[in-house]
Curated annotation (Swiss-Prot):
Catalyzes the transfer of the L-Ara4N moiety of the glycolipid undecaprenyl phosphate-alpha-L-Ara4N to lipid A. The modified arabinose is attached to lipid A and is required for resistance to polymyxin and cationic antimicrobial peptides. This is Undecaprenyl phosphate-alpha-4-amino-4-deoxy-L-arabinose arabinosyl transferase. It comes from the Bacteria. It is an enzyme of class 2 (transferase). It is found in: Cell inner membrane. It comes from Shigella dysenteriae serotype 1 (strain Sd197). GO terms for cellular component: plasma membrane. The keyword Transmembrane applies. Disulfide bonds: none annotated.
Length: 550
């Protein structure tokens, strides 16, 4: 009966965190609107080989992540939950692997369940795992690859070892097809310390070629198909998206070496108090083969991405699967022997919740700020934000009431965040970051437009997805569409600021022309260098400017 209660509790936990609240959150630009529109266009065009965004070639990522997102939209339809359905599926599958791997290592069902709950409740896992980007997919393939490698190395027969390495190659191949060649580098770096300390080079050299073969065979069909359709895809994807993005001086998202330290700290909430002890205990038990494997799996990718010039929090998502296992193992040890770390964890969660409550008041309409984040008419959003942090502090306090038994309720600290964050976003943020909000406000004006132009790729993708049309024209800025706009068949999909007046004169008689611009809050739209408009509708950071036929 206890096992049944645990399972019911786990399913309720998943429903409250990963299923029920997702549709209440509008899509964020530029990431979620971009991936939603790419998958919508894939379904609409039937082209499952070449990724397109706004009808233009889009070579920033390979195809597999778009396949999964497209299947989600195909199965469930076009709404906010369905855009995120594939992404949500990825951390849940990863959590299943965490359960399986923990059972393999320690043969303890309670520990396996705890590791799963810790993984799914980690702040970084939840934040990225419910956000429609490709990183949860690549994290799943990386975790699956590490599980496959362990399975292969623990097998006692040549058949078992061969099957494990073949499976490793398939997961690496799917990782390459999801986000590129980092899916090859990260697993290799992660296992090398373990292979060296355990002196398992022989198995690696004997069976490793099977992983290479299965990886190549996994990528080959689509790899050849994309070369036949778009011969320059691999050149662009390798040199621009890999070398330039991570290694060169002009790499995207440049950040210092220590960038991931605060990411690890924030990402480990609501289990931050256990982090030092988990890592220290793991290091102290480094003679244990499984512990070395988990430590190497956690630390090596972290060091690799710290050395790289380009950094984003999403890059280290796969590190948190082994970290969750280490945290769970240490938590049970602490509960038995020394609950001090569990008490510290409770106080950290209380402090985080109280700090959030105070910060919410400071930026609320009743706080000291001259320009509050929320306006007076958004009082209910302020109370939602207060509720988020109040619940966080409450469950932090509850874990201290009988710490040896209640410490695991820290998993419920983010419950308010999961249920209420969609209702607490300030209008001033929604108006700039949620194109759906803008579309809802201006639907009657946008719908009959013959041409729609905008100066933001994220807004363009949001307009395209909401209006179910891919002919949005870029105005003045090309952004990440620069490469796709260079193709001869993309002529007419970009209008510069200097050309706009002439372009308007040439196309005005064809129908309503709508210009959607991103502006600063204090910017005077009358000073914009554009022809006089027939209608202007300003929604804070986004402005709709319309020209009717004359």
């Amino acid at each position: 009966m206890k096992s049944v209660r645990y399972l019911i509790g786990l399913f309720a936990f998943i429903a409250c965190y990963y299923l029920l609240p997702i549709s209440t959150r509008l899509l964020w630009q530029p990431d979620e609107t971009r991936y939603a529109e790419i998958s919508r266009e894939m379904l609409a065009s039937g082209d499952w080989i070449v990724p397109h965004l706004l009808g233009l070639r889009y070579f920033e990522k390979p195809i597999a992540g778009y396949w999964i997102n497209s299947i989600g939209q195909w199965l469930f339809g076009a709404n906010n939950f369905d855009v995120r359905a594939g992404v949500i599926f990825a951390p849940l599958l990863t959590a299943a692997l965490v359960t399986w791997f923990t059972l393999r290592l320690w043969r303890d069902k309670r520990l396996a369940l705890l590791a799963t709950v810790i993984y799914l409740s980690l702040f970084i896992v939840y934040a990225i795992g419910t956000y429609a980007v490709l990183d949860p997919f690549i994290a799943f393939w990386l975790v699956a690859g590490m599980c496959s490698f362990w399975l292969a190395m623990q097998a006692q027969t040549w058949k078992g070892k061969s099957a494990g390495f073949l499976l490793l190659g398939i997961t690496c191949g799917m990782g390459v097809m999801t986000k590129g060649f980092l899916a090859l580098a990260v697993p290799v770096l992660s296992v090398l310390p373990w292979v060296a300390t355990q002196k398992r080079w022989k198995d690696l050299f004997i069976y490793g070629w099977l992983a290479v073969i299965s990886c190549v065979l996994t990528v080959l069909p689509w790899g050849l198909a994309i070369v036949q359709r778009e011969p320059d895809f691999w050149h662009y994807f390798f040199w621009v998206e890999h070398i330039q993005r991570f290694a060169l001086d002009d790499a995207q998202h440049r950040a210092p070496f220590w960038y991931y330290v605060p990411v690890i700290i924030a990402g480990s909430l609501p289990w931050l108090g256990l982090l030092p002890g988990a890592l220290y205990t793991g290091w102290k038990n480094r003679k244990h083969s499984a512990t070395v494997y988990l430590l190497s799996w956690t630390i090596m990718p972290l060091l690799f991405f710290s050395v790289a010039k380009g950094k984003l929090p999403t890059y280290i998502l796969s590190c948190f699967a082994p970290l969750a296992m280490l945290l769970a193992h240490y938590a049970l040890l602490a509960a038995k022997n020394n609950p001090l770390a569990l008490r510290i964890n409770g106080w950290i969660n209380i402090a985080f919740g109280v700090t959030g409550i105070i910060a919410t008041f400071v930026v609320s309409p009743w706080g000291p700020m001259n320009t509050p984040v929320w306006q007076t008419f958004e009082s209910y959003k302020v109370f939602c934000a207060w509720s988020i942090f109040s619940l966080w502090a409450f469950f932090g306090w509850y874990t201290l009431t009988n710490v040896e038994k209640t410490w695991s309720f820290a998993a419920l600290c983010p419950l308010g965040l999961a249920l209420l964050v969609g209702f607490s976003i300030p209008d001033r943020v929604m108006e700039g970051k949620h194109p759906q909000f803008f579309v809802e406000m201006t639907q009657e004006s946008l719908q009959p437009s013959r041409y729609i132009l905008t100066d933001s790729v994220g807004v363009a993708a949001g307009l395209a997805w909401s209006l179910q049309r891919d002919d949005i024209i870029m105005y003045r800025q090309t952004g990440e569409l620069k490469y796709g706009l260079n193709y001869p068949d993309a002529k007419g999909r970009f209008v510069s600021g200097d050309e706009f007046a002439n372009w308007l004169n040439q196309h005005r008689q064809e129908g309503i022309i709508t210009l959607v611009l991103s502006v600063d809050r204090d910017e005077d739209i009358n000073s914009l260098a554009i022809p006089p408009a027939d209608a202007i509708d300003r929604q804070e950071r986004l402005v709709l400017i319309q020209y009717r036929p004359k």
